[in-house]
Amino acid sequence: IRDRLRSRGLGDVYKRQVATILHCEMNGLELPEGYGILHHEEGIDILPANIELSGVEVSLVNVMSREYVLKQFIKTISPEYDYILIDNMPSLGMLTVNALAAADSVIIPVMAHYLPVKGLEQLMQTIYKVRKQINRKLQIDGILLTMVDRRTNFSKEIIELLHDNYGEYINIFKTAIPFSIRAAETSAEGVSIYKHDPKGRVAEAYKKLVEEVIGDGSERK
């Protein structure tokens, strides 16, 4: 993957990670404007992360106002963007709390498997706790089903279980992201699903999801 980044002119800045930026925020160090932000050829900006981010979690324990470190950084760049997406690891640690503290709203992706659905309850408790104690404006946009294979009874049972347990009080998006090998290939290729498989089912599903989440965008700006 690093070779592909170099071929796109991104190799030299790949070492500039979210971890570096958060460490600077924790220590009150200033960074050059736009530090670490990669301008992708498909028209979006990306701030990458790697395994070093795990070490940040340990460092956050002893930091004053540790829940707001990510929010402090996002404040410095938010005027430049209409939307900022924070992609979290499946974890309930301090990094996730930082993301929830910085966010306006949450989309909860859940794979159509038993264990992810089972773990959803703990995540919901974390979200409600953050909303009560840290970020009162935090909203839940909805639950997004991913890697769905509607050909199997198992997927159908998981979807039914999710609707039974959460459908009455949390929005479950009508759009579900189907399972696709072509979609799994995009990470290795370093391109989006719209470039790798623009006419595929996954690309079409994400287009529908965008329409479902933001419509024409007027209510979100």
Question: What function would you assign to each model-found segment?
Answer:
Residues 2-221:
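P-loop NTP-binding core
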